[in-house]
């Protein structure tokens, strides 16, 4: 049988029909180190692809149960920015198509900024609908962060077109009349919620980068508004902006305001 060049093998590997293909056994017997290294990389890539597909099927469990019940438009809901001392709380709602496949999708907190940005673009391209709700720091101070988060989620759902038939929500209840399921750690257990977590996180991070350009002395692009030593020191030195949550204890304490 013909001995392939390494370049020919690179082109051939994607065509092989698994290890039962007679050409696979021929390649395994090839003693050239370059060929064996190529095969090892190919096997690892296939293992990664298999793991990604298995993870995707795990993430789609709740969605598939609803599809089986005849429910088509399922929106995942999640938020970003409940804990920071500055900036808005952002919620997102995402309806994915039934045939969606987004390998690498996961809870946004588990992903690098570059991976989140890449998935953000993929979600935008494939989603049936995306809605975003933003509630400002002033509104958070007026309502409290829990109520503000619920209102951000309600805004995100209202922004969806077409409207969803059912909601999967990360650990909260959205104030609306739609049927919904509250899932603990939903962003790690539902594809729709994980997609919403990406949209919410990237949207809020971009917002904070814009604030960093307006208020460079606070370091918003580095800490995203969280209460880091750098941020607290900046508040003590420069005071607060309109984007700071004055009702949050660390901000009050940094300003010397009693609870």
Curated annotation (Swiss-Prot):
Predominant location: cytoplasm
Keywords: Cytoplasm, Endonuclease, Hydrolase, Manganese, Metal-binding, Nuclease
Localization, UniProt: Cytoplasm
Positions that bind a divalent metal cation: 78-79, 170
Record-listed E.C. numbers: 3.1.26.4
One Gene Ontology term, aspect cellular component: cytoplasm
Enzyme class name: hydrolase
SUPFAM superfamilies: Ribonuclease H-like
Keyword Cytoplasm applies: yes
A Pfam family annotated for this UniProt entry: RNase_HII
Example of a GO MF term: RNA binding
Biological role: Endonuclease that specifically degrades the RNA of RNA-DNA hybrids.
The family this protein is said to belong to: Belongs to the RNase HII family.
Protein name per its UniProtKB record: Ribonuclease HII
Organism of this sequence: Geobacillus thermodenitrificans (strain NG80-2)
Lineage of producing organism: Bacteria, Bacillati, Bacillota, Bacilli, Bacillales
């Amino acid at each position: 049988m013909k001995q392939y060049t390494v370049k020919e093998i690179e082109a051939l590997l994607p065509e092989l029909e698994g290890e039962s293909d007679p050409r696979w056994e021929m390649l395994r017997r090839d003693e050239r180190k370059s060929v064996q290294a190529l095969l090892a990389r190919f096997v690892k890539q296939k293992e990664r692809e298999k793991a990604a597909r298995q993870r995707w099927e795990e993430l789609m469990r709740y969605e598939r149960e609803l599809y089986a019940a005849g429910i088509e438009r399922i929106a995942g809901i999640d938020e970003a920015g409940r804990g920071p001392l500055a900036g808005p709380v952002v919620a997102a709602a995402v309806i994915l198509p039934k045939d969606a496949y987004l390998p690498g999708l996961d809870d946004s907190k588990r992903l690098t900024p570059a991976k989140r940005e890449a998935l953000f673009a993929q979600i935008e391209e494939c989603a049936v609908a995306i809605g975003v709700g933003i509630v400002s720091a002033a509104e958070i101070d007026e309502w409290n962060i829990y109520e503000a988060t619920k209102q951000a989620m309600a805004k995100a759902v209202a922004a969806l077109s077409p409207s969803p038939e059912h909601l999967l929500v990360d650990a909260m209840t959205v104030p609306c009349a739609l049927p919904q399921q509250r899932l603990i750690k939903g962003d790690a257990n539902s594809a729709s919620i994980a997609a919403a977590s990406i949209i919410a996180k990237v949207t809020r991070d971009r917002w904070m980068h814009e604030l960093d350009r307006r208020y460079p002395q606070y370091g918003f692009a580095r800490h995203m508004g969280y209460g880091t030593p750098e941020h607290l020191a900046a508040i003590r030195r420069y005071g607060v902006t309109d984007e700071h949550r004055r009702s949050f204890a660390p901000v009050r304490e940094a300003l010397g305001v009693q609870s």
